[in-house]
Curated annotation (Swiss-Prot):
Protein encoded by which gene: rpmI
Record's GO cellular component terms: cytosolic large ribosomal subunit
Database matches in InterPro entries: Ribosomal_bL35, Ribosomal_bL35-like, Ribosomal_bL35_CS, Ribosomal_bL35_sf
NCBIfam families: rpmI_bact
Keyword Transmembrane in annotation: no
Signal peptide positions on this chain: none
UniProt region (Disordered), positions on chain: 1-29
Protein name as it appears in the record: Large ribosomal subunit protein bL35
Assigned keywords, A-Z: Ribonucleoprotein, Ribosomal protein
Source organism superkingdom: Bacteria
Similarity annotation: Belongs to the bacterial ribosomal protein bL35 family.
Gene Ontology process terms (BP): translation
GO molecular function per UniProt: structural constituent of ribosome
Amino acid sequence: MPKMKTHSGAKKRFKLTGSGKVKRQQANRRHYLEHKSSRLTRRLAGDQIVSTPGEAKAIKRMLGK
């Protein structure tokens, strides 16, 4: 049986941590930053862990893990 292909969009957006959690970047930090406060842009700088177990499971399946 052939191997499953990795979802290209998912592999660009998500990374797995050593413990198996799914890491993602936060939204709203790509453009139009001029009118956003420095406080907001700093807060959006860090990565987040995907909190919903169902979503994390679906992402892992797309990544082939």
